[in-house]
A protein has these predicted regions:
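Transmembrane beta-barrel wall of Gram-negative outer-membrane proteins
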Residues: 187-215, 227-274, 295-307
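Outer-membrane beta-barrel pore domains and translocons
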Residues: 47, 144, 165, 182-188, ...
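Short, acidic, small-residue-rich periplasmic hinge/interaction motif at the N-terminus
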Residues: 11-68, 76, 106
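A beta-strand signature from Gram-negative outer-membrane beta-barrel systems
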Residues: 133-180
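Transmembrane beta-strands of outer-membrane beta-barrel proteins
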Residues: 177-181, 207-209, 264-266, 312-317
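Hydrophobic, lipid-facing positions within transmembrane beta-strands of outer-membrane proteins
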Residues: 40, 97, 158-160, 177-179, ...
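Flexible loop and strand-edge segments within Gram-negative outer membrane beta-barrel domains
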Residues: 220, 242-248, 261-313, 319-339
C-alpha cells in the first residue's frame, strides 16, 4: 500500500513542476506581445481565378504547355485526349476530321475560333485537321454551354462546344520581334515545315504572321485476307494504299491591340488543299479516282471593353468564303465533277 502511495505522490510532484514552467513561459511571451512588433514583408503571388472553373458545366482544358508536350500536328489530334469525345476520321492522312459528343452528331457540335463560330455553309462540317497547334494557346471542351453572358444562339443550341484560343504575341523586355521555325516529318512521306513571326509595333499594338505546308503521300502497306465458309483462305493480298495523298498550305495573320479597359484583335486566315479520297478496301480494287480541292478563307475582328464593374461590351464581325471542288474519275463508276 505504501509503495502505491509513494508512486502517486511522485506523479503529483511532476505535474506541479510542469505547471510552474508553463506559467513562467506564458509571462515571458505576454511581455513581448505587449510591445510593438516588426513583421517582415510577405509577398503573395497567385493567378486570377479563371472563369471556366466557376462554370455550371466544368470544362476540359488543354493549355499551351500541355499542347507542346503532345505528339500532335493539328487541333483534331489534340482533341482526342479529351474524355467523352468521338473523333471521326474519314480516311487517309488528309482525311476530313470532325468531332462528335454525346452521340448527337457532328452537326450539333459548335466550334469557335477566338470566340467566333467556325462553319461551312456547304456541308455543315468543320474540318479540325486544318487548324495547326502552332498558333493555338488553349483548347476548351464543354459538354454543353459555358456560363458566359456573351453567347450566340449557336452556343445555346449546341450539344457540345469547342473553343480554340489563338496565341497573342508576348515579348521579353527589350525585344521587338519573335521568330520560330519548325520542321516535322513522319510516316507515309509526311513533310510539315512551319514558321511564326511576331512584331511589336508599339506598346499597345503588335502583329503576328504564321504559315505552314503539309505534304504526304499516304502510301502504306496493308494486307487483305478473306476465308470462305469452310474456313479456307479464298484470297490473300498485300498491296499499297493508293490515292491517300495531301498537299495543303495554311497562312494566318493577326493584328492585336490593347486599350485602357479592353482589347481588340483582327485576324485573317486562308487554307488551300488538294487531297485524295482513298475509299474503302475492296477485293481487287486498288485505285480510287476521287479527288477533293478545298479553299477556306475568313477575316474576323473582336473588340471587348469594360466600361464599369457592371457594364461590359463585346463586338464580333466576320466574313468567310469557302470553295469546294470534288471529282470522281473512276472508270467503273459514274464520273462526277462538282463545284460548290
Amino acid at each position: 500500500m505504501s509503495r502505491i502511495y509513494c508512486g502517486g505522490g511522485g506523479i503529483s510532484t511532476a505535474v506541479q513542476a510542469s505547471d510552474k514552467a508553463d506559467s513562467t513561459t506564458n509571462r515571458r511571451y505576454v511581455g513581448k506581445l505587449d510591445s510593438i512588433q516588426k513583421i517582415n514583408e510577405v509577398i503573395i503571388v497567385g493567378t486570377p481565378v479563371i472563369p471556366k472553373y466557376r462554370e455550371v458545366i466544368p470544362a476540359q482544358v488543354l493549355k499551351e504547355v500541355d499542347l507542346q508536350r503532345l505528339n500532335s500536328l493539328s487541333v483534331a489530334d489534340a482533341i482526342r485526349y479529351f474524355a467523352g469525345v468521338q473523333l471521326k476520321d474519314y480516311g487517309g492522312v488528309g482525311g476530313l476530321k470532325t468531332v462528335n459528343i454525346r452521340s448527337m452528331g457532328t452537326n450539333h457540335m459548335a466550334v469557335f475560333y477566338d470566340g467566333i463560330q467556325l462553319g461551312n455553309a456547304q456541308n455543315g462540317q468543320v474540318d479540325l485537321g486544318r487548324f495547326s497547334l502552332d498558333d493555338v494557346e488553349e483548347i476548351s471542351l464543354y459538354n454543353g454551354q459555358k456560363s458566359d453572358i456573351f453567347q450566340s444562339a449557336k452556343d445555346f443550341g449546341a450539344s457540345g462546344t469547342i473553343y480554340i484560343t489563338t496565341r497573342r504575341p508576348r515579348f521579353e523586355e527589350g525585344k521587338r520581334a519573335n521568330f520560330k521555325a519548325t520542321m516535322k516529318t513522319g510516316s507515309f512521306g509526311l513533310i510539315n515545315p512551319s514558321m511564326r513571326y511576331e512584331y511589336k509595333i508599339s506598346d499597345a499594338v503588335s502583329s503576328s504572321f504564321s504559315g505552314e505546308w503539309i505534304n504526304a503521300t499516304g502510301r502504306y502497306k496493308f494486307r487483305y485476307r478473306r476465308r470462305n465458309t469452310l474456313g479456307e483462305i479464298a484470297y490473300d493480298t498485300t498491296a499499297y494504299r493508293q490515292n491517300g495523298d495531301i498537299n495543303a498550305t495554311r497562312m494566318e495573320a493577326g493584328l492585336h491591340g490593347k486599350m485602357a479597359d479592353g482589347q481588340w484583335t483582327v485576324r485573317a486566315y486562308t487554307y488551300n488543299s488538294e487531297r485524295g479520297i482513298p475509299g474503302a478496301i475492296v477485293n481487287n480494287v486498288f485505285r480510287h479516282g476521287e479527288r477533293l480541292w478545298d479553299t477556306n478563307s475568313f477575316i474576323q475582328g473582336t473588340l471587348t471593353n469594360r466600361w464599369s464593374k457592371k457594364f461590359r461590351t463585346l463586338f464580333n464581325t466576320k466574313y468567310a468564303a469557302d470553295y469546294t471542288h470534288y471529282e470522281n474519275q473512276d472508270a467503273k463508276l459514274i464520273q462526277t465533277k462538282n463545284t460548290y
